[in-house]
Amino acid sequence: MSTVSIKGLEGEAPTKNEVLLNWIAENVELFQPDRVVFADGSQEEWDRLTTQLVESGTLIRLNEEKRPNSFLARSNPADVARVESRTFICTPTPEGAGPTNHWADPAEMKAELTERFRGSMKGRTMYVVPFCMGPINDPAPKLGVQLTDSEYVVLSMRIMTRMGAEALAKIGDTGSFVPCLHSVGAPLEPGQEDVAWPCNEEKYITHFPETKEIWSYGSGYGGNAILAKKCYALRIASVMAKEEGWMAEHMLILKLTSPEKKVYYIAAAFPSACGKTNLAMLQPTIDGWSAEVVGDDIAWLRFGEDGRLYAINPENGFFGVAPGTNYSSNPNAMRTMEPGNTLFTNVALTDDGDIWWEDLENMPEHLTDWLGNDWTPESSQPSSHPNSRYCVPLAQCPVAAEEYNDPQGVPISAILFGGRRPDTVPLVSQAHNWDHATMIGALLSSGQTAAAEGTVGALRHDPMAMLPFIGYNAADYLQHWIDMGKKGGDKMPEVFLVNWFRRGDDGRFLWPGFGDNSRVLKWIVDRIEGRVEADETIAGYTARVEDLDLTGLDTPIEDIREALSAPAAQWKSDLADNEEYLTFLGSKGSAVPAEVLEQFEALKARVAAAES
């Protein structure tokens, strides 16, 4: 029996962990909630909370025949996405956070947020949400506990993590956990009516790498509030990984099976809007090949006993961008939602209680848009917010690989980097070695499109697709990649650079993409197995058109040949920008690894040789 008293808790706490109970009790005094509830992750809890939120107007219950046990939330229009400008890495010195993060002094930030948190849960319930990152049966699990005043967050965490009583049992009486504090920052005075989506104009998403803590205030949305996702799984985990000799990466994990039934596991890091979820749920268009998903967003990679790199998916669900997802671009994502049990946010509502978003089939004549207004096809604004989301259990995916529940993880054969480049970067190239791969990842970028703000064609750098998520100095992060390569030696995965987005002079895409990307994956497997040669280009070992399986593809061979080219003039025009970016990455307390700089000098030499 614990001696710790928690104000507002009905009955006895379901744990004897004194550290956990004392932490909860201290924060109850700070936040001053009306009630304290331990989230158990049960169906009864889901039903109770969803019913409560439907009654309060936060959720809309969808058509039970079309979307069983599914709900739509509409957020405050000022709370619709991750707020990178209000995301802080709080290390003792600015050099610890490095050039790519917003830094704040840990003591000052804690003092400021403590005052923000004081009384911020008045009139609300504090939920204690224990969760496990990755399979619950992991013998050495990474655990966390989030305190939150948002029922929406509790529901989202139930989908996205292994949450509740099982995770609390894993923490046990003496186990450690990452403490996560979250408040929407909207206290209620007695008699004050609540709003459908409580939040605060002031937002803080703060990380304390030294003490492995996460404090978030003011937002109820997505990665700002579901703290297991980017905050823990990438920002804090990347620090843990550096300290403990593993990797936390913004990567999908794909299981690929050949016609001979040989299995390959591929991890891939793409910046946003570059097709990560679509590749994770790939439907191959070449006979005899099948693909399954282990994860669509985050990979934790550790060395196995055999010296190879093994990956787990620390998540348990998909938190996908809705617009653009349909039965053509990603049929498996659509099928994952068909059984229901899905939380939709900021999409449109049909008149018969279903959902709709841009690029979905069968546009209705009338909708209620994400702001609650009437919408017709003639409306000038999109019906759904561009960052609207579906949150759905991974287990419902028809191509979910059973290995996603294996705590040993899966051995990675290849790592892919890819951006959205209309020119320059070939369809697929292999890195010369791990050091070359690290440079490729460090300089990963996407070209601006006409749809984006900024100069068309200008590069947006996103090293390893981790720019918003590296929890420490980016130069030290690159050094960690180099160090992992040294440790793994010749057992490290082969690394490839892909680009599905090459365009011709007239602006058309040169490669069909989507399911046909399986043809590129087949070439990658052929390279791993030593079955095909490659052309030595500026980019690396680039595929030859005759080695790609183009059976049944009606794309002109000239287009594919152009997609595989690495024009020297285009590579040369990137060099100054890339050199400047490497200088930037090394500009705050830590140097970019010598190996990366040597690889960049070798790249410059290849460009010069190709020009002569």
Swiss-Prot record:
Its main location: cytoplasm. The keyword tRNA-binding does not apply. PROSITE patterns: PEPCK_GTP. Its EC number is 4.1.1.32. One of its GO terms (molecular function) is phosphoenolpyruvate carboxykinase (GTP) activity. Pathway: Carbohydrate biosynthesis; gluconeogenesis. Coiled coil: none annotated. Disulfide bonds: none annotated. It is found in: Cytoplasm. The active site is at C274. It catalyses: oxaloacetate + GTP = phosphoenolpyruvate + GDP + CO2. Mn(2+) binds at K230, H250, D297. GO terms for biological process: cellular response to glucose stimulus; gluconeogenesis; glycerol biosynthetic process from pyruvate; oxaloacetate metabolic process; propionate catabolic process; response to lipid; response to starvation. Pfam families: PEPCK_GTP, PEPCK_N. Its cofactor is Mn(2+). Substrate binds at R82, Y221, G222, G223, S272, N387, S388, R389. Keywords: Cytoplasm, Decarboxylase, Gluconeogenesis, GTP-binding, Lyase, Manganese, Metal-binding, Nucleotide-binding. GTP binds at A273, C274, G275, K276, T277, N278, R389, R420, F514, G515, D516, N517. It comes from the Bacteria. Binds 1 Mn(2+) ion per subunit. One of its GO terms (cellular component) is cytosol. Belongs to the phosphoenolpyruvate carboxykinase [GTP] family. Monomer. PANTHER family: PHOSPHOENOLPYRUVATE CARBOXYKINASE, PHOSPHOENOLPYRUVATE CARBOXYKINASE [GTP]-RELATED. Catalyzes the conversion of oxaloacetate (OAA) to phosphoenolpyruvate (PEP), the rate-limiting step in the metabolic pathway that produces glucose from lactate and other precursors derived from the citric acid cycle. This is Phosphoenolpyruvate carboxykinase [GTP]. It comes from Corynebacterium diphtheriae (strain ATCC 700971 / NCTC 13129 / Biotype gravis).
